[in-house]
C-alpha cells in the first residue's frame, strides 16, 4: 500500500495536468493597472474564471455594489470608446495622467491607456489634500475624478495660498457623479478644460460632453417625462434617463445628451429577445443568464423566439407602468449596428461553450 501511495504521489507531482497553487496565473492590482489606494475598499484575492478578462464592481453609495464581469470580447469596444474620448478631448499621447480613483481604470481598461501611451498614476492617499499635493508636485497633463472633489481641492488651493503651484491647462475628465457646474468657473482660473465623461463599469465609457462614444447607442422614451430619454447601449438599457436638448451640453454645444441632469429610470426596462442569429434557443437563454450575472441587466427570451434570423431583434419593455400596472408598450432595437454590445456578449458565450467541460463529474444535470 505504501509503495502504491508513493507511486501515486510521484504521478501527481510529475505528471499532473492541473496546476498547483504556485503554478496558477495571477492577476494583481498592478497587472490590471489599478494599483492605487481607495478609502472604500479592501483588497481581496479571488479565483476568477478564465473566461473573464477581469472582475470589478459597480460604484454607488445608496445600495450594495454589483460584481461586474468584463469578457475578453468586450475589451476592443471599451478601448475604441476610450480612445475616441481622448481624441475628442485633444489628449496628447505620452502625457502624465492622474487617476484619483483607481477603479476608474477598469472603465477605460488598462489596454486603452497603454495604447494611447499615457503614464498613469494614483494618489498617495485617497483624500483631497493628497490630490492637491499631487497636482502641485507631479504636474499632470490629464486627470480624472469626481467633479465636486476636484472643485473643492482647487478652492482649498486658493485658501492655502497654493494657487500659483496648480498646473495650468490641465485636461480634466469628470466622472462618477453628475457634473458639478460650479467647477467650470473655478477651473477657468487655471485655464483647465473640463470634460463630462459618462459611463459605467459594466459597459465602459459611453459619452463625452453629451456626444456618444459608441455607434450602438440608442435613446428611447423615458418614464421620467417627454424631455427625457432612456439611455441604451448595444440593446441593453442603462436605467439612466437624461434630457435631450438641441441647445447642447454646457461643455460642448454639439453634445445633445445632458448627462449632468441624470435621473434614475423607474420603472426600469427589461429586454425581450424576439429574434436571434443563433441557431439555438438554449444558447440564447444562456446569454440572457450571463448578462444578468455579469452585467445586472434583465434579459428574457421570447417563448416564440425566432432562431437563425438574419438579425437580432430586441424589445425593451417597462416591467410595470408608472401606475404600477403591467404594460405592453415596447421599443424595438434591431440590426448589427444598434445591438453590437449584445452581439459581443453572444460572442463571449459561444467562446465559453467551445471550452465547456465534458467530464460528467462537472455536469449539473444527470
Swiss-Prot record:
Keywords per UniProt: Cytoplasm, Ligase
InterPro entries on file: ANL_N_sf
Cytoplasm found in the keyword field: yes
Catalytic activity, as annotated: holo-[ACP] + acetate + ATP = acetyl-[ACP] + AMP + diphosphate
Function, as annotated: Acyl-carrier protein (ACP) acetate ligase of the biotin-dependent malonate decarboxylase multienzyme complex (EC 7.2.4.4). Involved in the conversion of the thiol group of the ACP-bound 2'-(5-phosphoribosyl)-3'-dephospho-CoA prosthetic group into its acetyl thioester using the energy from the hydrolysis of ATP.
Signal peptide range in chain numbering: none
Native source species: Malonomonas rubra
GO CC field: cytoplasm
Record EC number: 6.2.1.35
Principal subcellular localization: cytoplasm
Compartments reported by the entry: Cytoplasm
Gene Ontology MF terms in the entry: ligase activity
Protein name: ACP-SH:acetate ligase
